[in-house]
Every structure is written in C-alpha cells, then in structure tokens.
Amino acid sequence: MRKIGNVILDDTCYQGRDLYTDGAIEDEMLEIARNVSPDRFNKVIGEKKSWPILYHFSHIRENILSWMPFTGKEKVLEIGSGCGAVTGALLGGAGEVTCIDLSMKRSEINAWRHRDSEKLKILVGNFQDVEKKLTEKYDYITLIGVFEYGEAYIQSQDPYVDFLKIIRKHLKPDGKIVIAIENRFGLKYWAGCTEDHFGTLFEGIQGYPSTKGVKTFTVKELKKIFQEAGGFESTWYYPFPDYKFPMTIYSDRRLPRRGELNRTEYNFDRLRMELFQESAVYDSILDNDLYPQFANSFLVVIGQDKFETETAYIKYSNERDPRFNILTQICQKPDGSRYVQKLPTGSKAEAHVSNIYDKGQALAPLFEKEKLYVNSCEKVSYGVKLEYLEGISLEEKLDTLLKEGQLDEAESLLFTYLHKAERLYGSQDFKESPEFIQVFGQAGLPEGLKGGMLADIDLVPANILLGKGKDWVLDYEWTFDFCVPAHFIMYRMLHYYLESDGKRHVLKNRDLYEKAGISREEQEIYAKMEQHFQKYMVGKHIPMLSLYDEISPGKLDVMEYYDRIRGCGDERKLQVFFDRGQDFQERDSFKYPMTRRGLCIDIPVPAGTRRMRLDPGEVPGGFKISRIRWRDLGRAAFHTNGFALGDHCYYFGGGDPQIILENVPREAEILTLELEALKEQEAVKEFWSRFAREENEKNAQIQDLKAQLKQKEAQIHEMENTKAWKLYRKLKPEGKGASSKKQE
C-alpha cells in the first residue's frame, strides 16, 4: 500500500504485472497525469491530436455521471475505473470513492490526476480477488463501460447475471448500480460504425458470430439479465451521441424530438461507413416510438427499488470558455409537473447563468410587440429556474412540412418569424461599437444596415415554441446589450435551420437569404462574424468536434459512391455510327440505353450504310460479344480495338472501345447485338495472363528465328570455305560495269 498525493493505492491483491496494457501510450498518459494539471488537459488534447489521449483525458467523459443527484455523503464503488476518466465526476459529488482496476499503470494515472483528493482510494487487482476483501456497503456501484466485459470478470455459465449477483452483496439496501453500456442495436452500427470493442462492421447487430469475450446487449436482453439477477428495478437513460462522450442525456420521461439527433461524428477511433442519413432515420424511429430500441448507448440505474430523481433530461453546453459552461435540465416532480433549470458547471460560469434572468426580464416587453413571450425565469441558489412549456418548436413544425412536401408552406412559415426578427431589431441605424467588435470582430459591414439593442442572436427556429395561442422564446442565453444588425439575427435563423440537418437542403435552392434581403456580401461577412462569435464563446478551449478531421480516420460515404456508380450505369449509352459515304459523323448516329451489365438489342440499319461503328463507352472490364448477326444474313464480320481474351471476350484497358463492321451487306436491315460486361478484376487478370503468354510466344519465336539465322550464317560460312566456292569466286564476273569495260 502506498500513497500518491492524498490518494491511497492499495496493491494487496495485485499480482505483480498488468494483464492488459495499451503499450507505450500508457507511459505517455502517466507523464501527462503527473506533470499536467487537469485544467490544462484540454490543451494537451489539442496538441497531441491522439485518440487515446482524447478518450482518457477529455472532460466530456465525466458528463455521464456529473449530473447525478449526489449529496456529498454517498459512498461509491467504481469498478473498472481505468485511467480515471469518470472518477472526477464521482469525486465532485460523492463523499467517498473507492476504485477497483486490474492495471497498476492505469491506477497510477488515476491517482496522479486526482492526487489532491482526500476521499479517493484505489484497489489494484483482479475484481474477483478484490471484492472478497470488501467490507463496506455502498450507496452506488458504477460500471461505466465495464459490464460488457462480464465474461472476463466472472468465470461461470452465466457471467453477466452472476456479475450483478456478486456486486449486489456490496450494496446498501437502498443502494443503486449504475451501468453505462453500448446498445447492441444502436443506430450508429446499422449506419456503418464498427463495433466498439472489436472494430468490425455489424459484429454486434449480428449477435457476435465471430468474436468472444465482450458482449453488449439490447433493451430486452438487459431487462432479462436484471430480472434473473434478482428482480432489479431499472430506470433508463439514453446518452447521445453515446455514453463515452455524452452531450445530451434523454430518458423515458423525456425522449428526443424530431430534428434533435443530428450529430454523426462518433468515430474518432476508427474508419466508418456512412450508409444512410442518420438524422432522417432517427426522425422516422421517433415517429414510431422506437427510440429506446435504437439508442446508441444506455445509462441504466438499477436497484431493489426504483431510482428516484426529478431529472428527466440533461443537456451539456460545456465545450466553451469556462465562463460560459452550463448545464440544462428538465425536471419532473412527483405530481408530474415540470420545470427547467440552468446551472453553471463551475464557479466561473455563475455570472453568466445569473445574467440569463436579467436578460429575460429585459426582453419580455420587447418581444411582446411581436406577440412573442419569454418563459418565466427566477433566480435560485444553484442557478436559474424556468417555466417548462409544452408545444412543438418552429424547427419541428418546419421539418413536418418538409416531410409532407409542403415546401411553399414551410418557406412562408419561416418568413413569418424572419419578419418578426426584422421588425424587432431593425429600428435604428447600425454602428459597430467596441463591445460589438469584442464579440463579433471588425466586420466591415456595408453602410445603411439597421440594427437593434437587446439582441437575442439565438432566436433560431429550435428556440421558438409554437404554443396554444402564444409563441414562446425558450432560450435567450446569448442576448447582448449593444446594437446588432437585424440581418445577422435573420442570417442565423436561416443558417442554423438549413445547415444543421441534411434533410433540409431541399430549401437551399430557393434563395432564402436573398429573399430575406441578405445580400451575398452580407452573407460572407455574417459567416465571419459567426466564426468570431464562436471563438469568443469557446475562448482558448478546444472543442472535441474541432479535432474530428485531425483525429478521426473519417467516413466512407457509401451512398455517394452508390449514386456515382448507379449514375454511371444510368448514363451509359451505346452510340452507333453509320457511314453512308461521308465517314462516321455525330449527326449520323443513334444512342441506345445500356446498363452496367450490358445490353441485347436489334439495331435498324439505314439504307445505303457502308460501314458501322459501335461505341459502348467506358467499359472498365471490357465485354463479351455474345451475339453479332445480320438478321437473315448470318454472323457479322467485325474488328475491334480491344485485346482478344478468347471466347468472344475483349479487354480495352480503360480506353474507348470500338467495334467496326466493314462492308455492310446492301440487303442488311437489322443488326442483332448482345454485349455482356465483364468483371474488371477477372478481365484484367486474364488480359495480363494472355499478354504474358503472347509475349512469351513472341519471344520464343524471335529466339527461334535468331537460332535459324545463326544456323544459316554458320552454313554460309562453311560453304564459303569449300574449294568449289573459292573456285566460283575466281571465275565469277565482277559486275556489269566490269563486263562492259572488257567488251570495249
């Protein structure tokens, strides 16, 4: 047993060596934990641009548990704590935290990063050995990304059930087990993400046919395990995009709404395929009340009794400058009534949250001019508390109209609110102020723009609720006291609706910006203003999504590839040229549709045709001329610029293939043609095989001719040395000139 800072590291059950390791990267992570303070981890992540560093040191990892209703008195057991990515969330809320992990190196990383905590103890060793020595009873036992390894922890016929039975022995009577795990049926896996643990496509959704040792589960499968382990009551939450980096956590009491699930950048660690547009599929799933079955991850709280908490929904906005990091919760009381609260995630953001109340009070009379109403807000000790309102957002309504094909109606509705914003914020001449420049930069906007004070720049469709007889503005966090151009607020309304979801692109060719009076020059300037605002909001913080292109192996857009290949097939034509005495000319040709597999067609032959040329276009693998005949006249003679592969097959090496028929019979009326496209790989292989064979045959012929030549030369040389040849040379006339001279 030893201490790192204030942290107790108990190695009583440690076997002397780590049974699993990620290698040298763990040494690097240990150095980071030793030498870098937690408030600088984000800077290191930005510098390293490494998946392991991001995964183990990102503050977003703590979002999965930092919302839990800890009172500061709870005793928590964290099983499989690893490098401590989630441990900090427990230390921030609970009274005592005990960690168990098999790896000494990872436990040291955990200890170093939390060395200032006086309420952390880490037990290093195999779980089955360590748990036998546990004497405490715990309020919470957490399994964050651990339960799926039950087969490795427990050697039994039913390891996952037995795992929970063993854990249960260490719970207080009213204690809870908290499990975060991937959903085997998570939509991201159907859409082309690889299985998280094995890195293979579709392994989980097919039931793990090729792998062993790790298993994730569906809702039904987990409920069955919970029941068999002792009749646990379960409360379900759904972290999005997943439990590893959750920015929103839904529950059965507050499921996602249409348009909310539009983030697909999950794959920081592995290449993924993109088989379909997930946001559109999510909307369809939501329409059919199937979201829990297809959520990417689960966060399940189980116990002898139901987990009681008012929190029904959690949204983190903590990828910002610490001054602006907040948490939004929807809470439900036992009587069913709801309220919303916004909390600072740290002391530096307290002023920002308090400011929300002040802005709401100031905006109320302004918005009422356009029959918009601010949901009531009050200051409380922990932040602000807001009224919970029912209805659908303007964003949802617009999406519904698009789904129904009512594009004109959607445009008209959108412009109703654009005009409201223009009237609200177009009352005075705009002029850049120092405060404006601090937030939006020196924009260089054209003269003559109108603007307004108390500018709620987040007056976007997602934040406008269409209620019964009243429209409500739900979020006015980003409201500024200085003058902002009305067109910029309108630009953001359009931009954040049109650009945040691919299914809304059907409106993009309607020139909505121009119709709203926002010139192209303004659009370019507003885009730069928005970038400057985002920099102001995040400060020196490096958001995880900004690193996607540098860390992630990326996506393969299968639909784009499919459309391209299908398009090639749809556009492929057989062009037939007829030479009627003026050679082949474009005006004397016809085009016939041709599929990727080929074609079978009867081609009428115009009178007077002397020659024909058939151009099938690019055929990567070449083709087989299965049939080429004159009707009633027999097989048609032809030649081609392709390489003959045998059996009427020809390869063109990616060139422009041509089939030429010379001497077309005068009586020819119909040419029957059947082409069959060859598979490229097979054709290329056969081409090189035949090419090599022909080259070898030619080389052999050349060598044979050289040998014959050498033999003839030897024969000549031998003949020249005979007496007869020498006598002949003496008697042979010297030539015509010599003979003539003698005759003279």
What are these regions (language model features)?
Residues 1-36:
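N-terminal auxiliary segments of SAM/dcSAM-dependent transferases
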